[in-house]
Amino acid sequence: MVPVVALVGRPNVGKSTLFNRLTRTRDALVADFPGLTRDRKYGRAEIEGREFICIDTGGIDGTEDGVETRMAEQSLLAIEEADVVLFMVDARAGLMPADEAIAKHLRSREKPTFLVVNKTDGLDPDQAVVDFYSLGLGEIYPIAASHGRGVLSLLEHVLLPWMEDLAPQEEVDEDAEYWAQFEAEENGEEEEEDDFDPQSLPIKLAIVGRPNVGKSTLTNRILGEERVVVYDMPGTTRDSIYIPMERDGREYVLIDTAGVRKRGKITDAVEKFSVIKTLQAIEDANVVMLVIDAREGISDQDLSLLGFILNSGRSLVIVVNKWDGLSQEVKEQVKETLDFRLGFIDFARVHFISALHGSGVGNLFESVREAYDSSTRRVGTSMLTRIMTMAVEDHQPPLVRGRRVKLKYAHAGGYNPPIVVIHGNQVKDLPDSYKRYLMNYFRKSLDVMGSPIRIQFKEGENPYANKRNTLTPTQMRKRKRLMKHIKKNK
């Protein structure tokens, strides 16, 4: 599960500035749902290759007496769902009553909390933080988020050790594996069999979407049809529910972000939406089903979720629910709107269903299996290089400064999603249009459907670049004789 870091504190203490610092390697804004999350922002960040979700909870300006209400409205859910809390205060404003009330609440939650004193630039470090020791939160970390001072130390001494304890990184060098495979093929050696068999593992399927689109109805419809094995494995308070099931001889793990409830207790009015659960379910899934309400059409929230799914590289099946009862004219309008707003998602199957009545639900799993198979299929270096060569023969790369971009060979760089690494000269100068052409060519040639495909380019290195040739003693003697001969004949 992807770890979660929540930034809390009063307004204008610099939470958004630190949020942007932490998420600078990714798109800072992942989802912004006014009215549902009370202006909280969710972003993906990275420390030395370890990803985590960062939450900017917005300002809490309550007093000692009323802070609990304000916390419940804006930040309580984020704090409960977070693995660690960075509590930010303002060194220039000094200790405020709201700071004390927030600290009291955090101490009562027994959540790992680190006190970050911002805006310490231009102040005496010792004097700037001394008042905040009374909050009883242990060591203090002074920073100046706007200038980046102290942020690196915060990452190295707080977040990185905490993430290592929470989720130790597996010491697996996939690149070495791929290069070993490539060299073996180049030398004519037999390619070693990959021990990993994706067909032997259950497909993790996440059903996500906005509130009231029918996620729970669809979940229970799926579980109610040809159900073989169903039992709940509840995790912590912030975890989704994982439900193992079997369908048509294939094992699945259904990730329910809203929680599975008894059929009689399901009502759209009480279906709750947790952004964190949704984002974590997407990260943990192999295939994501995005459920859209046909009567409401595509919303900005749907597009935000789509953006996160694409950034995560997950396979995708789009489900348009509540299709029953619509007139033919309205159905045509809905399809036109989908084609217009989802034109950039040309690899995903779109299904029109009624979860309530079950129409179209049975066809979903064919697309789920297709998407999973496409994302996990193993393709050898020779095949990928052959496809790349055919693509170049059909449409050559453009000239760059009078020289043709040369693509040398291709190999697999990863799976789920499939990654093709292309080596060549001047590849950094390839225009985006040609990169899209290559991506579409590989997709068509490999018959990839339901899964995104990524193309990465690596520049060929000249081993003699910036190196001076060292002459041997014999070459030096020959050079001297040649120079004497040239001078003599001048």
UniProtKB/Swiss-Prot annotation:
Keywords: GTP-binding, Nucleotide-binding, Repeat, Ribosome biogenesis. GTP 2 binds at residues 209-216, 256-260, 321-324. Coiled coil: none annotated. Disulfide bonds: none annotated. Residues 3-166, 203-376 form the EngA-type G domain. GTP 1 binds at residues 9-16, 56-60, 118-121. The keyword Transit peptide does not apply. Residues 377-461 form the KH-like domain. GO terms for biological process: ribosome biogenesis. Pfam families: KH_dom-like, MMR_HSR1. The keyword Lyase does not apply. GO terms for molecular function: GTP binding; ribosome binding. Gene3D superfamilies: 3.30.300.20, P-loop containing nucleotide triphosphate hydrolases. SUPFAM superfamilies: P-loop containing nucleoside triphosphate hydrolases. InterPro entries: G_ENGA, GTP-bd, GTPase_Der, KH_dom-like, KH_dom-like_a/b, P-loop_NTPase, Small_GTP-bd. Associates with the 50S ribosomal subunit. Belongs to the TRAFAC class TrmE-Era-EngA-EngB-Septin-like GTPase superfamily. EngA (Der) GTPase family. This is GTPase Der.
